[in-house]
A protein has these predicted regions:
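Acidic-glycine-rich active-site phosphate/pyrophosphate-binding loop
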Residues: 1-11, 42-56, 236-255, 287-305, ...
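N-terminal signal-anchor module of multipass membrane proteins
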Residues: 2, 6-41, 45
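A structural signal for small-residue-enriched, beta-sheet-centric alpha/beta enzyme cores
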Residues: 2, 22-25, 54-56, 144-147, ...
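Conserved phosphate/anionic-ligand binding catalytic regions in large, soluble enzymes, centered on
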Residues: 20-36, 258-275, 317-320
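Early transmembrane hairpin of solute transport permeases
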Residues: 31-127
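Hydrophobic alpha-helical bundle architecture
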Residues: 38, 280-293, 303-369, 382-389
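Flexible, glycine/charged-enriched surface loops at secondary-structure junctions
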Residues: 44-48, 88-93, 114-116, 193-197, ...
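Signature of multi-pass transmembrane helix bundles
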Residues: 109-255, 422-428
């Protein structure tokens, strides 16, 4: 068993990475940075200039903004400036009202918001907001993490400058993980230390159930529950996993004012990691202990993979999140560490290379593909089948497999990222 100090550090890591969020985290992070700049300014900004990394721009172009019925960055920036509260972090737009949305529309129409691509930076998650008004100027910068402020300044007076610090230093030091360490923590830590993870079950299941009752995005979650689809897929554990996961994503990408529990700065990852585990646990009458440990295993696997992949990349986040849920489902099927490792290898062999072309309603389709693969990979692992080291990017050591996956997503797909962004920004 891990020492108490090691467990405390891992629990603190989970609590940093698994947090509530309303709306897609990229435009919400921009709204958060704008809100902080406006707070520093001390008055309503007359002009807001926003400069973003390409990945932030890509992920914020086509997604709904909570409570607005609108898509994209301008309304997120406007509302961040007018009603955002930075203390709410990824729920910064919690207080949005119809009146505030109307104010935001006017703010945009008055050409008070300017959004540009930040040139000459290596950081994939970078947000810089300059707010001007009443003869004053304030600047806020977020980098490395969706809520990680690294620079604050008003009228030349710098109150925070951590631009040279790493994200790990900002978060109090990175916790070194391996898949076996993730497994050991999830399966041996005292249960009372892990019960907090059940909040992800409550929040994300509620998001899916609200989506079933409404019209959100492409309505994939509801479609999978229709009579025609039931005739094809049946009313099974598998079909329920797909419908719950896609429904929660439908609502989130459409901009519903519905909170979800995010993972590593992504709400969709926070949906795809635990919800398949929750549904499988409920449908198989798993004990609370089994459910808790499976949820921790899923969430912490995602956090581990993201440590080397980075917050944003050209690789769709559902690849990572569904790998976590596959681990959790394998555990609930009675799998041991070897079978969980096999499920991870099966996932990497299958989904590596799925591109991220921004946050948008059709993300629910990708999440559904990811979690369907998660179930298949778990079933293969439990049946004794695992992709072998002679096949493609798979190696005997599961941690090396994970590093191969993250190297492809972090480094190998950079040109893919540039091409995708070029296509998205030059559409007629």
């Amino acid at each position: 068993m891990l020492s108490q100090n090691e467990r405390k550090r891992i629990i603190a890591l989970i609590n940093r990475e698994v947090v509530p969020a309303i709306g897609c985290t990229e435009p919400i992070a921009v709204a958060l940075c704008t809100a902080r700049a406006a707070e520093l300014l001390g008055s309503r900004p007359e002009k807001v200039a926003v400069r973003l990394s390409a990945n932030i721009l890509k992920n914020a172009m086509g997604v709904g903004i909570p409570g607005t019925g609108m898509i994209g960055l301008p309304i997120a920036v406007a509302l961040g400036a007018l009603v955002g509260r930075s203390e709410y972090r990824l729920e910064v737009l919690r207080d949005v009202t119809p009146g505030a949305v109307e104010q935001g529309r006017r703010y945009i129409d008055e050409k008070r918001v300017c959004i540009d691509l930040k040139q000459g930076i290596a950081e994939k998650l970078y947000i810089e907001v300059e707010a001007r008004g009443a003869g004053h100027c304030a600047t806020a910068v977020i980098a490395g993490g969706h809520t990680s402020f690294v620079y604050l300044e008003r009228d030349g007076e710098v109150t925070l400058d951590k631009r040279t610090a790493s994200a790990a230093e900002e978060d109090g030091g990175e916790v070194p993980l391996t898949l076996h360490r993730v497994w050991e923590f999830a399966t041996t830590a005292p249960l009372d230390e892990l019960r907090f993870i059940l909040e992800t079950r409550r929040l994300n299941k509620a998001a899916a159930e609200q989506a079933f009752a409404g019209e959100f995005g492409h309505c994939l979650g509801r479609t999978l529950r229709c009579e025609r689809e039931r005739k094809i897929m049946g009313d099974s554990i598998f079909s329920r996993i797909l419908s719950y996961t896609s429904a929660a994503c439908d609502a989130r990408m459409a901009g519903a004012m519905i909170p979800v529990m995010s993972n590593s700065g992504s709400g969709n990852q926070g949906i795809a990691a635990p919800l398949p585990v929750v549904v499988y646990a409920e449908q198989t009458a798993a004990t609370e202990q089994q459910t808790i440990r499976a949820l921790v295993l899923s969430h912490l696997t995602v956090i581990y993979i993201k440590q080397s992949l980075g917050r944003l990349s050209a690789l769709c986040g559902c690849v990572v999140a569904a790998t976590g849920s596959s681990c959790g489902i394998t555990y609930l099927m009675g799998g041991d560490y070897g079978q969980v490792a096999a499920a991870v290898k099966n996932m990497i062999a299958n989904l590596t290379g799925m591109i991220c072309d921004g946050a948008k309603p059709s993300c629910s389709m990708k999440l559904t593909s990811g979690v369907s693969t998660a179930v298949i990979s778990a079933m293969m692992a439990m049946d004794g089948h695992c992709v072998t080291p002679v096949e493609g990017i798979i190696e005997e050591d599961v941690d090396k497999c994970i590093r191969n996956l993250t190297a492809i997503g972090r480094d190998g797909m950079n040109e893919t990222d540039r091409v995708v962004l070029g296509i998205m920004t030059h559409k007629c």
